[in-house]
């Protein structure tokens, strides 16, 4: 087995299980890809996988990352595609073996990190696009889902900027209103 994928508990305010609706069993690369395409959810998190070391290293080298590139966002999605295409035998286990605690203050939920998240998503997309001769339906699904995430981050970033502009205008308005009232107050004997 080159890659073992399993279900996980994901906790936030309530406990839930990440379900992919994939039958437990051993798959070859193509069969597993077809199962993922049916669910339309690659579930690319690395914490729900056990990977053979040589497959992991080959997948990482396949990305051909430059040393100056540092990625804190979407790195799981970046590595997931080469891992999947390099794994000949994949076993899917329906039993949850891991509990992931969602941190509300993490980089993915931090409004101040939106601009960095957008840039890192763009880097991940560009690195994935640079992989040669490996364009499969799974590749296009991952690119599609990453572009949707990127669009959401960009919309949140733009919304935040609009809210910030509105906030600044509101402060200025209140400031001038205060000055005007102070001016009128000083006119009254």
Give residue spans per PLM region:
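Conserved nucleotide-sugar donor-binding catalytic segment
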Residues: 27-112
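C-terminal, non-catalytic tails of nucleotide-sugar-dependent glycosyltransferases
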Residues: 120-139
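Amphipathic alpha-helical repeat scaffolds of TPR domains
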Residues: 140-151
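Membrane-interface aromatic/basic loop that binds lipid-linked glycans or pyrophosphate carriers
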Residues: 150-189
């Amino acid at each position: 087995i080159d890659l073992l994928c399993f279900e996980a508990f994901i906790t936030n305010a309530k406990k839930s299980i990440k379900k992919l609706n994939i039958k437990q069993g051993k798959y070859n690369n193509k069969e597993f890809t077809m199962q993922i395409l049916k669910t339309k959810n690659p579930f690319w998190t690395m914490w729900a996988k056990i990977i053979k070391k040589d497959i992991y290293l080959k997948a990482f080298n396949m990305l051909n990352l430059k040393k100056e590139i540092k990625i804190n966002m979407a790195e799981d999605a970046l590595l997931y595609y080469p891992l999947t295409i390099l794994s000949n035998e994949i076993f899917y286990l329906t039993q949850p073996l891991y509990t992931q605690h969602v941190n509300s203050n993490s980089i993915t939920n931090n409004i101040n990190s939106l601009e960095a998240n957008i840039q890192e998503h763009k880097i991940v997309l560009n690195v994935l696009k640079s992989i040669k001769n490996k364009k499969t339906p799974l590749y296009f699904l991952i690119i599609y889902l990453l572009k949707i995430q990127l669009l959401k981050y960009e919309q949140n970033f733009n919304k935040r900027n609009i809210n910030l502009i509105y906030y600044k205008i509101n402060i200025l308005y209140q400031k001038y209103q205060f000055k005007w009232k102070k001016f009128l107050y000083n006119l009254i004997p």
